[in-house]
Amino acid sequence: MPKMKTKSSAKKRFKVTGSGKIKRKHAFKSHILTKKSKKRKLALTHSALVHATDMKSIKQQLRII
């Protein structure tokens, strides 16, 4: 049986850290930035961790489980 392929969309959007947590980027940072404050844009620049409730489905998409 061939190897299972990971979902390419998930592969491009998520990164697994050394401790096994999954990093993601924030949305709302691509266009229409003039009405957003500098503080908000700076906060959206930093990466965040995936919430525990979404962890199982993302790990399945990345074929970690």
Curated annotation (Swiss-Prot):
Tell me the superkingdom of the source: Bacteria
Query: Region Disordered: which residues?
Result: 1-22
Q: Which UniProt keywords apply?
A: Ribonucleoprotein, Ribosomal protein
Q: Which GO terms describe its molecular function?
A: structural constituent of ribosome
Q: Which NCBIfam families match?
A: rpmI_bact (TIGR00001)
**HAMAP family in the record:** Ribosomal_bL35
Protein name, entry field: Large ribosomal subunit protein bL35
Protein's organism: Flavobacterium psychrophilum (strain ATCC 49511 / DSM 21280 / CIP 103535 / JIP02/86)
